[in-house]
């Protein structure tokens, strides 16, 4: 039988392995995003509270709005905007994760298996995993930056309505069109530097921790490559990712949500370093960990849902475990 005919008989996952892994990771990320999105919205709202730069710009809403913790912020969204508003911005979030998670997972596995040449005995040095995780995060997030920008801005629309401000967007596609019209292609990548910085740290925590812990447990304990091992590994990865990623997440959210001039330049911050300095000087060091609790509470279940779903659908699709 000709080689071309033999290839046609192979399962799709073997004929197009990278495409299959991209789609499977996108599906797993969609499930995780839908399950935990209200915590992401709460986190974003918390990160915008008491923004010192807005006060200097003359936004009176900053002075009048009382500070709320995580629970009161979430309850406030339900009471003042409606229960379904907890999922405001979920559509661009799903768009983002299809691109972001697909890109980062395919990149990490390619680096691990092809570039760094994971050895046959499954030993994989931590430093290689760290580099692979950071590079995967950078590539995945750069590709997904436009969808992340729209997600962050749409998450703040409900708050703008309560403050009596005009809404900026009618929907996801209008948001893309408006940002593109006002800032051009460059406008869709606003905040990309702090975004990829955060993604590098988060994926160093998530991918590196999960991969390292999982294979350590499989090789050095009685645990097998099953749901228990996946669950323990994902718990660890969610915690480490939250600790490493929250400060960069605060900076990223503020830069992406700031008002801009006609050239697409931010009116509050010149750069991510400027945003960092203003936050620490105006609000204190702990302002960098605003939203840490909902971030951790979201990252941990998100990580669990994602990894358990991803490992399971890989198994069901005939793809080898991660």
From Swiss-Prot:
Q: Which residues cross the membrane?
A: 22-39, 87-108, 126-143, 194-211, 228-247, 287-310
Query: What is annotated about its quaternary structure and interactions?
Result: Homotetramer.
Gene designation per UniProt: Slc25a27
Q: Where in the cell is it found?
A: Mitochondrion inner membrane; Cell projection, Neuron projection
Q: How does it sit in the membrane?
A: Multi-pass membrane protein
Full protein name: Mitochondrial uncoupling protein 4
**Known function:** Facilitates proton transport across the inner mitochondrial membrane and may dissipate excessive proton gradient associated with oxidative and metabolic stress at neuronal synapses. Regulates glutamate-induced proton conductance in astrocytes, shifting the energy metabolism toward aerobic glycolysis and lactate transfer to neurons for ATP synthesis. Can transport chloride ions with lower efficiency. The transport mechanism remains to be elucidated.
The record's annotation in PROSITE patterns points to: SOLCAR
Catalysed reactions listed for this entry: H(+)(in) = H(+)(out); chloride(in) = chloride(out)
Keywords, comma-separated and alphabetical: Cell projection, Membrane, Mitochondrion, Mitochondrion inner membrane, Repeat, Transmembrane, Transmembrane helix, Transport
Q: What Pfam family is a match for this entry?
A: Mito_carr
